[in-house]
Design a protein with these regions (language model features):
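A solvent-exposed, acidic/Ser-Thr-rich amphipathic alpha-helical stretch
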Residues: 1-38
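Short, surface-exposed coil-to-beta transition loops
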Residues: 14-16, 50-55
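Short beta-strand edge/turn micro-motifs at domain boundaries
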Residues: 29-31, 52-84
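Intrinsic disorder/low-structure terminal segments
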Residues: 36, 54, 58, 67, ...
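Short, solvent-exposed loop/turn segments that connect beta-strands within catalytic domains
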Residues: 42-46, 64-67
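Low-complexity, intrinsically disordered terminal/linker segments enriched in charged
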Residues: 43, 47-51, 72-119
Length: 119
């Protein structure tokens, strides 16, 4: 499902911030704050969506390993810019690598131990 969602996006940048977990034996609940930026490609012109929200997670310990058992997504706010305000030629990022939501992302070359793309 995620690759289908990603098709119209040239930039996806999700930040996980505050993460609170409450344990109860072999079960746990978590609330995780997120900020997610997306630049969406459109025939009418690219636009940006910045979302602040939370994940409501449930976890279970199975055979000694903690795993997700469910997740709900909450959107607390959203900011849009139409047309897109992304400027990858701004002088402040001159000389920086530019990320991409696919195997052309610089992390594939720099982070060999992650073995990105391998299944």
């Amino acid at each position: 499902m995620l690759p289908e969602i990603q098709k119209p996006m040239s930039i996806l940048h999700h930040n996980v911030t505050t993460h609170n977990i409450k344990l109860d034996g072999v079960r746990a609940e978590g609330e995780t704050y997120i900020i997610a930026f997306h630049q969406v490609l459109s025939d009418l012109g690219n636009y940006d969506v910045l979302i602040g929200g939370r994940y409501f997670d449930e976890y279970e310990k199975r055979e000694g390993i903690w795993k997700f058992s469910s997740r709900a997504v909450d959107a607390d706010w959203a900011y849009t810019a139409d047309p897109s305000k992304v400027n990858l030629s701004h002088p402040m990022i001159e000389g920086a690598n530019i990320g991409a939501p696919d195997s052309s992302d610089p992390s594939y070359a720099y982070l060999k131990n992650f073995k990105r793309g391998e299944r």
